[in-house]
């Protein structure tokens, strides 16, 4: 079953490079959600690892009679959390020329590791420092939440508007993953990847 949605292609430089006007979104299935400190098997089609802001959204969103506005968003956010995403395809790609290439094959090998969920409590996600690292590989990549389609909440708003437009509905609370704050980081070595987002905390994935 579908348990959430992911915004993809949220980096402004990527949007400009591919001459796209907006990101895309894709469904996320329950079997692809893993608890913090979980294990992920990778294969030759794995592209890399990402660090992003995730939200748990109240199912009452689906009962909105009017178009959702930015003022409505805080009312339906149940939790916020750091998330590691492992990105992959079902088959080998020779490069990305459009979001069609990405979205047509998204979701095959993707896993999402969810960090500790917190209440929103007026946490401003517009400009938070982020870092993902693997000590064993001596690898560390820094980022910022402001690289995600202006900011993660704006990316969330984009996904919610698309869901309303497509008239998707179901009876459960759901996740929205807003896009990478560090780009796609190559997995140099198996072992523990730890992601940290200021104010949100730490998320850990064991790659094997």
Where is each model-derived feature located?
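Short, charged beta-turn/beta-strand-edge "cap" motif at the junction between a beta-strand
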Residues: 181-185, 199-202
């Amino acid at each position: 079953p579908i348990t959430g949605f992911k915004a993809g292609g949220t980096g402004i430089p990527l949007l400009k490079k591919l001459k796209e006007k907006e990101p895309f979104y894709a469904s996320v299935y329950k079997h692809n959600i893993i608890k913090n400190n979980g294990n992920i098997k990778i294969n030759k089609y794995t592209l890399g690892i990402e660090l992003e802001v995730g939200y748990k959204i109240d199912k009452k969103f689906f009962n909105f009679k009017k178009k959702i506005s930015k003022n409505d968003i805080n009312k339906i956010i149940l939790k916020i959390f750091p998330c590691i995403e492992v990105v992959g395809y079902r088959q080998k790609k020779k490069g990305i020329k459009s979001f069609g290439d990405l979205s047509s094959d998204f979701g095959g090998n993707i896993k999402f590791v969810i960090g500790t969920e917190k209440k929103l409590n007026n946490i401003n996600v517009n400009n938070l420092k982020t870092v993902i690292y693997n000590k064993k590989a001596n690898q560390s990549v820094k980022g910022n939440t402001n690289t995600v389609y202006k900011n993660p909440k704006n990316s969330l708003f984009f996904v919610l508007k698309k869901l309303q437009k497509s008239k998707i509905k179901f009876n459960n609370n759901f996740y929205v993953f807003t896009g990478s704050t560090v780009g796609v980081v190559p997995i140099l070595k198996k072992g523990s990847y730890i992601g940290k987002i200021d104010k949100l905390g730490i998320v850990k994935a064991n790659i094997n």
